[in-house]
């Protein structure tokens, strides 16, 4: 059975050495003078099995490994972004992943996010415990780790420190996340235990071990998945859309199954459904020593087979989206391919809610990953699309906010904000969160929701009628009615302009028209302990239905009293709580209803 190269993706936290490790893997060769070694594809690097065998010859005998895969195809762009963007039906495009962890720092938020994404996509992975050279006292040198891991080459203190860091910073965290894990040389059952391979992207130590372990695991457990369909048409995923001088818009893609030929038809997903376009050229990069003229970087291929990276030149590619599924087929297979691609596009469709926020991302896979992480924190999503932020998006978000301020948000993952959208945001109440790291965007979303809920709570409290008790001061009646003017003391709560007043027997007296301070300046409210002159408009006639030393209450409608009592009691000051309690007791007595306000 013919096997294709396993597709390998590299994930991990920022600054834990993903790019350095990838660079080290890509530069793998037997000697500096050896030509080639690594074949550079579009968007990926192929490490031939012969190169792996040569750099790992001492290990293959040790592990009794007989590698039959043609090599490894390592995706050039590290990180979650690339991993989530590169999807195919049934999960991730990558067959297997390398999770990079700084063995001196341990797990970080993005490490955990990477593991969650790998679990979600059911992608097997090994752990590269990087920065081995920074373990105190460790004598790190290029070559296999396993041949350097002994007391002949390492000081006993360095060996002890290594074991502590390996366990405390890597294995223990994996255990806490529900994985059995161990140093790769101690793993007895690879179906149950995660292999941890110590490496140094700086010195190159452990790179041969890493290549052997990942090749062996891929061959052993993914054989059916790696079976090459030598007769079938090509299946792949769009990496990105690129403008190339002399070619116009081109697609960079990873082909994971089948064979493609020049003159075949490209069938690819786009926002309108499916695009069909006749292929003008299938292009591969020239070797570095051929790249003398940057305008002449590519060479045409009559035929390509999986797994490979390829640049596709064809007409009408403007609306193709990164992460879209594609097929390359002869004319008589176009309809079958269209049905397949449509089905895959529909599987990427994100279920939306009746109300919620807008999310935008640069690729279908990224959009799906962002939506999944937001769902975990109970976010409601009204609209989820691939593409730049437009003025229309902002107008829609503004209309969503009119019914619920928590809906007035756009989250943008790795997309541009068009100039007219920026202008619209500046004059609207819409919040925009932008970023390139999903977990940070989710954290920012949670912080924004918390702030908005506090603001909304504050606004709602301010709209409610606040409880207060006041006493009419003796010798301070200045006018009996229309409006009545007198001096009062605020006993409990806050007296505000517009507050409705009632007597102790429940009679409506009117509402507070004006409050003045001691300098006779108008003020909006008087707090507990203040003595102020007030004017009261309504039924009140001082000396008849309200007299000196009488206690008056701000009349709080029952639904508002209930809200204050149940939802906002903790937000009230002590004197406001007292005013509310006394008012509710009075109303329960007047209404002969012990449940009033409860």
UniProtKB/Swiss-Prot annotation:
Region (G1): 12-19
Gene of this entry: infB
Binding site for GTP: 12-19, 76-80, 130-133
Region (G5): 200-202
Signal peptide: none
Region G4, annotated ranges: 130-133
GO cellular component assignments: cytoplasm
Family named by the database record: Belongs to the TRAFAC class translation factor GTPase superfamily. Classic translation factor GTPase family. IF-2 subfamily.
Region called G3, residue ranges: 76-79
PROSITE patterns reported for this sequence: G_TR_2
The keyword GTP-binding appears for this protein: yes
Function statement: Function in general translation initiation by promoting the binding of the formylmethionine-tRNA to ribosomes. Seems to function along with eIF-2.
tr-type G domain ranges (all copies): 3-225
Protein name, per record: Probable translation initiation factor IF-2
Any one Gene Ontology molecular-function term assigned to this protein's record: GTP binding
Keywords associated with the record: GTP-binding, Initiation factor, Nucleotide-binding, Protein biosynthesis
A family per Pfam: GTP_EFTU
Chain positions covered by the region annotation G2: 37-41
């Amino acid at each position: 059975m013919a096997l294709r190269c396993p597709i390998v993706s590299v994930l991990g936290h920022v600054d834990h050495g993903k790019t350095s490790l990838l660079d080290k893997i890509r530069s793998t060769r037997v000697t500096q003078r050896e030509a080639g070694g690594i074949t550079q594809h579009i968007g990926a690097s192929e490490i031939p099995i012969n190169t792996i065998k040569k750099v790992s010859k001492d290990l293959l005998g040790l592990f009794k490994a007989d590698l039959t895969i043609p090599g490894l195809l390592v995706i050039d762009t590290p990180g979650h972004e690339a991993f989530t963007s590169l999807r195919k039906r049934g999960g991730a495009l990558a067959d297997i992943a390398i999770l990079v962890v700084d063995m001196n720092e341990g797990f970080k938020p993005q490490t955990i996010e990477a593991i969650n994404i790998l679990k979600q996509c059911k992608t097997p992975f090994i752990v590269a415990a990087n920065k081995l050279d920074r373990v105190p006292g460790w004598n790190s040198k290029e070559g296999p780790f396993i041949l350097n891991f002994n007391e002949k080459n390492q000081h006993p203190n360095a060996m002890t420190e290594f074991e502590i860091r390996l366990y405390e910073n890597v294995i223990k965290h994996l255990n806490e996340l529900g994985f059995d894990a161990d140093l790769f040389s101690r793993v007895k059952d690879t179906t149950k235990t995660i292999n941890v391979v110590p490496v140094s992207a700086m010195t190159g130590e452990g790179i041969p071990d890493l290549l052997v372990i990942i090749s062996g695991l891929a061959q052993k457990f993914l054989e059916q998945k790696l079976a090459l369909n030598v007769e079938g048409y090509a299946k792949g995923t769009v990496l990105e859309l690129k403008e190339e001088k002399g070619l116009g818009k081109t697609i960079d893609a990873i082909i994971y199954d089948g064979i493609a030929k020049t003159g075949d038809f490209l069938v690819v997903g786009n926002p309108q459904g499916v695009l069909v376009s006749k292929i003008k050229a299938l292009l591969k990069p020239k070797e570095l020593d051929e790249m003398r003229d940057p305008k002449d970087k590519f060479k045409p291929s009559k035929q390509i087979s999986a797994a490979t990276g390829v640049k596709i030149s064809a007409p009408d590619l403007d609306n193709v989206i990164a992460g879209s599924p594609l097929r390359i087929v002869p004319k008589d297979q176009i309809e079958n391919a269209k049905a397949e691609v449509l089905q895959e596009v529909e599987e990427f469709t994100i279920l939306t809610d009746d109300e919620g926020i807008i999310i935008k991302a640069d690729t279908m896979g990224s959009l799906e990953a962002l939506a999944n992480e937001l769902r975990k924190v109970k976010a409601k999503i009204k609209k989820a699309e691939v593409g730049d932020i437009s003025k229309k998006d902002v107008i829609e978000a503004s209309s969503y906010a009119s019914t619920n301020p928590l809906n007035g948000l756009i989250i943008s993952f790795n997309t541009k904000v068009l100039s007219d959208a920026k202008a619209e945001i500046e004059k609207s109440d819409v919040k925009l969160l932008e970023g390139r790291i999903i977990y940070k965007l989710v954290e920012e979303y949670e912080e924004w929701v918390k702030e908005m809920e506090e603001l909304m709570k504050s606004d709602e409290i301010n709209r409610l009628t606040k409880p207060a008790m006041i006493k009419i001061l003796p010798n301070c009646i200045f006018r009996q009615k229309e409006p009545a003017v007198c001096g009062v003391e605020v006993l409990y709560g806050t007296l505000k302009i517009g507050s409705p007043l009632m007597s102790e027997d429940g009679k409506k007296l009117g509402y507070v028209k004006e409050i003045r301070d001691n300098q006779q300046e108008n003020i909006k409210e008087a707090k507990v302990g203040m003595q102020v002159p007030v004017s009261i408009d309504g039924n009140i006639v001082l000396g008849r239905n309200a007299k000196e030393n009488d206690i008056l209450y701000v009349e709080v409608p029952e639904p508002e009293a209930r809200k204050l009592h149940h939802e906002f009691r903790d937000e009230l000051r002590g004197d406001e709580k007292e005013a509310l309690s006394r008012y509710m007791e009075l109303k329960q007595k007047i209404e002969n209803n012990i449940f009033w306000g409860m």
